[in-house]
Amino acid sequence: MNAEQTTGRVWNRRRTEKQRRLAEANMPGKVIPTDQLVSVLENLLAPGDRVVLEGNNQKQADFLSRMLAEVNPQKIHDLHMIMPSVGRSEHLDLFEKGIARKLDFSFSGTQSLRISQLLEDGLLEIGAIHTYIELYSRLYVDLSPNVALIAGYKADRKGNLYTGPSTEDTPALVEAAAFHDGIVIAQVNELVDDECDLPRVDIPGSWIDYVVVADKPFFIEPLFTRDPRLIKQEHILMAMMAIKGIYAEHQVQSLNHGIGFNTAAIELLLPTYGEQLGLKGKICKHWTLNPHPTLIPAIESGWVESVHCFGGELGMEEYIRARPDIFFTGPDGSMRSNRAFCQLAGQYAVDMFIGSTLQVDGLANSSTVTRGRLSGFGGAPNMGHDPHGRRHATPAWLNMLTEPDPMQRGKKLVVQMVETFQAGVKPTFVETLDAVEVAKTSGMPLAPVMIYGDDVTHVLTEEGIAYLYRAESLEERRAMVAAVAGITDIGLGVDAKRVAALRQSGKVVYPEDLGIRRSDATRSLLAAGSVADLVEWSDGLYNPPAKFRSW
């Protein structure tokens, strides 16, 4: 018998503390009256708690976040907030009021400027900026939550939860708390009496401690909807190069598209330009993707075999219900999204990730963290890296081999698709990422790089494509990036003879090298030129949010 055994160590402190707090709340069942939520939170929380708050990419537990911001800072303070997405003003009100102190997150979007300011003012401490699945993983290691605040559509009085198309992060967040003696509170839009009144059970009631009916339906952002009317000729040109110079060249059959008008253009060119090239059935068959409305024409044209989704998208519910062969749906017909599983699929099961960024340096390192803007990364670092644990082969993965060797491995295609200048004439290509200086001023141990250059296989701009996986040295890699960087300082740093040699060797291609005339990149190539066209393609099943309606 060792010394620890003789001291009578207590092995159930977390469980005992949870039971104490539940007794303090003194609720007769699992349903918290809407108007009592603030006082209940003050009984269930303690200073310094680790609190998961569902902020997702789209779905927001906004009633819980608003009520959390109303607790008494004298009672509840210095919380350690763990949030996949920081997207609402009250998320940061928590820090201004002293209710919260530390933040671990993945993405901030609209709150990126304010996070940076709060950090500068000393009101907020950053634990780390994560990719989504990294943050979920830490909930099961060193960030076990004391409390999880999540959102669903419906619940019964036993806590059974229907999360439906917007399941997103919820299962990963709930399980970490429910099975390590954390407290789980779910806000719902509607309370029903019995399980049989739920469309299906996405999370069992035994995982949920309390449910509360919100004062209004939870906020959800149509984050991945892009109006085709805003797609420019530059986007179309880049999309043509992507389809012919990357997708067809490497036989990309499974993929993820990042958010943006450039990838929306690719989706809308598949039924037109892709058809002209005879590529249907050869590329773009399997997708890990939010249900982009701009993918509807490709689905209807027979290009797409399957789509697994990170989250839902407002207006796509009935279209998805009518296409169960394509999407993952439950017996009730509604989609089941799951960001954790979709991120895993995007890491190990797809041939390619293609997405944009705000800054790229000379070696193709990229970041969305810039001076005064701490936006985070979302899923890009996970989707946009080559997982060395992968063992199954596909044509595209094998196509990245540069020499025959049975001990070599293939590689995921990671494509950075950017215009050489951002809006406001800010160069995308820079000598040094702002992230380096941000790390110094913020006391971060490492620069917040989104995608490291050694994972990037291609850089695609309106100038052309750099096939970086074929670079034979860092110096050549830098020259290849410069060759497609336009008139930025990076681009002006390479001479015409070097560019000509790179084009001659096929390591860099311009549109003309692919047989693409720039004058052919017109909006007439788009399978849909407006949101109304997407509705027509869907046979009226797509119901776009009001802000995207022009009729």
Please give the residue ranges for each predicted region.
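Conserved alpha/beta enzyme-core scaffold
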Residues: 1-551
